[in-house]
């Protein structure tokens, strides 16, 4: 889930990830929950950031457990971040320039084998 606000995107460092390793937020859909509501709930649970508009971006088959990853773009309604400390241990906003600089300095962004990196690259390459 690519959460954005005023030209910045919200990325997180998940428990067990190396310092400087950021990725988009992710989660699961609950029983009888819409995909859009799942995005809003997961972002709020992991970062405390409320989300408004949610837009589909892309999907990817995922082998475990015979699942699918669905990429969404979401608009944050606030900037203040409060990480849950369980799944997410750090989260911060990045401008496109900061994200490109982070990646150039060997900072890790997303997983090469997942939709996560596709979503980030798509956002980085958009004209501003």
Label the model's feature ranges.
Residues 31-35:
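Glycine-rich phosphate/ribose-binding loops and adjacent secondary-structure elements
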Residues 18-22, 84-128:
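Nudix hydrolase/Nudix homology domain
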Residues 56-59, 93:
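Hydrophobic/anchoring residues in structured secondary elements
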Residues 51, 68, 76, 88-90:
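A broad structural signal for short, well-ordered beta-strand segments within beta-sheet-rich domains
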Residues 1-24, 28-29, 50-55, 74-76:
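N-terminal strand-loop-strand
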Residues 60-83:
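Active-site-adjacent beta-strand/loop module that shapes the phosphate/pyrophosphate-binding cleft
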Residues 25, 39, 43:
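Hydrophobic alpha-helical positions that pack around
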